[in-house]
């Protein structure tokens, strides 16, 4: 009679260890893939932001306007003042101030800017419908169609100009839009030393990307509850 070997542990199959090893390998592969994708996205975002910043900082007013009219997109300091100076200099025959707050009257704008009353009466139009840059583009297109303009000078802050021109050209590809950047006026120091300017550029870059997404998808997920700045 064979002796039963008590106390000897049964031999384990290698199948369980192999399955666990393959599971760990798959998790490691997925984790590496996620990290690589995140790093690639972060790099692309950084490169895009650098390109956007260089574009904003290198924007200069055109040497020759050759434009029929002027539109100023409200929301930043000095935009309307610059547009009125350009109108007085003959850069266009009319000026549209797009995105005016409904509670603001033409006379209050004239007094604030110190504009000439005759110039306001003859040659300045006010748009009250736009709440954001997309709305500016829609409002401007209607105004252009009413007057039959072909070349329009667009006045807005330098950081806002890329998005403003993109929205206008997307909404109205038949019109030639010429950008006129208004400096932010933050002083002589480097832009990266000014935290407020860095935040403005970062926020505007995200909006710039959002405008491209909306143009491609045709979706407008969010509409602002108040006027954009």
Which positions does each model-derived feature cover?
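Low-complexity, compositionally biased segments
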Residues: 7, 18-20, 84, 175, ...
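N-terminal Lys/Arg-rich, disordered targeting/topogenic segments
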Residues: 1-30
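Generic low-complexity, intrinsically disordered sequence content enriched
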Residues: 10, 43, 105-106
């Amino acid at each position: 009679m064979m002796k039963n070997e008590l106390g000897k542990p049964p031999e384990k199959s290698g199948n369980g260890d192999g399955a666990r090893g393959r599971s760990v390998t798959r998790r490691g592969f997925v984790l590496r893939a996620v990290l690589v994708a995140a790093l690639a996205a972060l790099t692309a975002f950084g490169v895009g932001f650098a390109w956007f910043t260089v574009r904003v900082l290198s924007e200069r007013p055109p040497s020759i306007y050759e434009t029929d009219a002027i539109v100023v997109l409200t929301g930043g300091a000095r935009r309307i003042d610059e547009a009125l100076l350009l109108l007085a200099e003959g850069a266009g025959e009319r000026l549209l101030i797009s995105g005016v707050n409904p509670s603001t009257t033409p006379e209050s704008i004239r007094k604030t800017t110190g504009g000439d009353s005759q110039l306001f009466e003859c040659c300045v139009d006010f748009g009250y419908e736009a709440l954001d840059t997309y709305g500016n583009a829609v409002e401007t297109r209607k105004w252009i169609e009413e007057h039959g303009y072909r070349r329009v000078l667009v006045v807005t802050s330098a950081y806002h100009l890329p998005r403003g021109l993109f929205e206008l050209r997307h909404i109205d590809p038949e019109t030639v839009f010429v950008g006129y950047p208004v400096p932010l006026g933050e002083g002589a120091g480097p832009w990266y030393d000014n935290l407020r300017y860095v935040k403005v550029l970062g926020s505007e870059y995200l909006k710039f990307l959002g405008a491209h997404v909306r143009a491609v998808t045709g979706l407008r997920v969010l509409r602002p509850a108040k006027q954009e700045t």
